[in-house]
């Protein structure tokens, strides 16, 4: 079922979308777009606490996803089941579930949204594009994406409501 959905998404393939989604997915590589945004927020006194919370959410989501859940589930990537699909990016060697790009992106996007809707809405839109790019590029199953969304969102909610909400209302 999931491979059928991925194959349907893959049928959207065209040169423009190929370049677009390769560029979008690269923003999520090693969480670089989120780390840069976090540093920018840290450098502004008004947004420093938000930057700390966002980066902490990113760090915890990455740790739980990459170090605990991926080795525990040990799910192979979709391209291993369908080798005739041409992969447009370097083939990831780590396990598939949950999507690290998606988890990191939603950790940051959700945390920003909880703190500041103006910052959060564009961040969630970017997170959604990054998540979709992982399926378009055939490196994640839809449930990997869902797992990343749930993990990143859960970490952000826990951090925000247990630690940061009070600190941010004091500002």
Predicted regions and their residues:
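Membrane-water interface at transmembrane helix exits
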Residues: 41, 65, 69-74, 113, ...
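Membrane-embedded catalytic cores of phosphoryl/pyrophosphoryl-handling enzymes
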Residues: 86-171
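Interfacial segments of alpha-helical transmembrane regions
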Residues: 37-63
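Alpha-helical transmembrane segments in multi-pass membrane proteins
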Residues: 53, 57-62, 66, 148, ...
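Hydrophobic, aromatic-rich transmembrane alpha-helices
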Residues: 34-44, 105-110
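Small-polar-interrupted transmembrane alpha-helices in polytopic inner-membrane proteins
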Residues: 56-70, 121-133
């Amino acid at each position: 079922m999931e491979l059928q959905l991925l194959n349907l998404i893959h049928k959207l393939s065209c040169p423009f979308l190929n370049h677009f989604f390769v560029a979008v997915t690269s923003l999520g590589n090693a969480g670089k777009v989120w780390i840069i945004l976090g540093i920018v927020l840290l450098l502004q006194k008004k947004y420093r606490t938000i930057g700390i919370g966002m980066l902490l959410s990113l760090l915890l989501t990455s740790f739980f996803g990459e170090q605990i859940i991926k080795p525990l589930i040990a799910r192979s990537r979709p391209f291993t089941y369908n080798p005739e699909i041409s992969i447009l990016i370097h083939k990831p060697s780590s396990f598939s579930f949950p999507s690290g790009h998606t988890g990191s992106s939603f950790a940051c996007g959700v945390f920003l949204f909880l703190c500041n809707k103006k910052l959060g809405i564009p961040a969630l839109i970017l997170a959604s594009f990054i998540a979709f790019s992982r399926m378009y590029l055939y490196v994640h199953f839809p449930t990997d994406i869902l797992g990343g969304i749930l993990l990143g969102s859960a970490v952000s909610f826990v951090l925000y409501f247990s630690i940061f909400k009070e600190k941010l209302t004091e500002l």
